[in-house]
């Protein structure tokens, strides 16, 4: 069982009590020093009148970050990791792990990086050159040709992502030479994530798995737009190479483009520019 403690003022404790009111356990309080006690799933939290807030349980990482989000506690350094390209037929899968120090958070907030999911591709192309010299990041891009080799060997998308995230997190930790919170935008359960990594020589395990992680810490938002920037550059390069402006996503318009490319260049070219296990391709050209 893991545990963690905060020190809060009374207004902060009141806010937490209000947010967690459905989990309060009033009948178990028999100590005058306790302000409130609650149970949420397998996690216990105790707030003391002196401001100490104690949390314990097996999987407390996400709850710790949730509390920081509730109280708008953002002034801590962290590594955030995110990926792009996983929903696009064309182009690479890009994973980025970015370290944002507490000192650089205001700079990124002023650029509205925290709203990364709302940024247009045009805005991302403008912003990324402004931030890449302010933060430490590690990035890897798996092109479609290599992706297709891996999937043919039995790797599923989540396993590929887990391996890439683990590698980039480890690489970034070596660069910054310090221990900080590591936050990953959750794409599978922690159990599955580490199971995908069971054959890796080195695995980083102190990870906070969070839904909508870019809202938890701006380092994830930074990783997201840097990865998107690299992905877009890859799409532009592939488009230039074959003389076609490749479409993003996996829509019916993409289906039409796949069919056109197949008729003009054949499957060998598709294998180099597209993720061939996507239904957009398998339903047209690969029969069971």
From Swiss-Prot:
Belongs to the RNase HII family. RnhC subfamily. Coiled coil: none annotated. The gene is rnhC. Manganese or magnesium. Binds 1 divalent metal ion per monomer in the absence of substrate. May bind a second metal ion after substrate binding. One of its GO terms (biological process) is DNA replication, removal of RNA primer. This is Ribonuclease HIII. It comes from Phytoplasma mali (strain AT). GO terms for cellular component: cytoplasm; ribonuclease H2 complex. A divalent metal cation binds at residues 82-83, 185. Its EC number is 3.1.26.4. Keywords: Cytoplasm, Endonuclease, Hydrolase, Magnesium, Metal-binding, Nuclease. Endonuclease that specifically degrades the RNA of RNA-DNA hybrids. NCBIfam families: rnhC. InterPro entries: RNase_HII/HIII, RNase_HII/HIII_dom, RNase_HIII, RNaseH-like_sf, RNaseH_sf, TBP_dom_sf. GO terms for molecular function: magnesium ion binding; RNA binding; RNA-DNA hybrid ribonuclease activity. Its cofactor is Mn(2+); Mg(2+). It is found in: Cytoplasm. SUPFAM superfamilies: Ribonuclease H-like (SSF53098). Signal peptide: none annotated.
């Amino acid at each position: 069982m893991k545990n963690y403690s905060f020190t809060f003022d009374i207004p902060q404790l009141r806010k937490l009590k209000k947010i967690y009111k459905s989990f309060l356990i009033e009948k178990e309080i028999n100590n005058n020093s306790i302000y409130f006690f609650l149970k949420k799933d397998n996690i216990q939290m105790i707030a003391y009148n002196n401001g100490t807030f104690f949390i314990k349980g097996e999987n407390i990482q996400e709850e710790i970050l949730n509390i920081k989000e509730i109280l708008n506690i953002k002034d801590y350094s962290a590594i955030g990791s995110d990926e792009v390209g996983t929903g696009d037929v064309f182009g690479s899968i890009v994973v980025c792990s970015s370290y944002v120090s507490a000192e650089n958070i205001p700079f990124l907030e002023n650029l509205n990086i925290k709203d990364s999911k709302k940024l247009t591709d045009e805005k991302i192309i403008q912003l990324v050159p402004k931030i890449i010299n302010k933060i430490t990041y590690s990035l890897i891009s798996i092109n479609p040709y290599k992706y297709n080799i891996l999937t043919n060997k039995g790797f599923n998308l989540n396993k590929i992502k887990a391996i890439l995230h683990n590698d980039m997190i480890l690489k970034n930790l070596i660069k910054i030479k310090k221990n900080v919170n590591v936050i990953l935008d959750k794409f599978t359960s922690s159990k599955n994530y580490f199971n995908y990594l069971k054959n890796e020589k080195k695995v980083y395990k102190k990870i906070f798995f969070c839904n909508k992680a870019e809202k938890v810490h701006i380092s994830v938002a930074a990783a997201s737009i840097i990865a998107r920037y690299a992905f877009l550059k890859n799409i532009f390069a592939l488009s230039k190479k074959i003389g076609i402006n490749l479409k993003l996503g996996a829509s019916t318009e993409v289906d039409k483009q796949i069919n056109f490319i197949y008729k003009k260049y054949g499957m060998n070219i598709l294998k180099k520019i597209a993720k061939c296990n996507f239904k957009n391709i398998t339903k047209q050209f690969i029969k069971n």
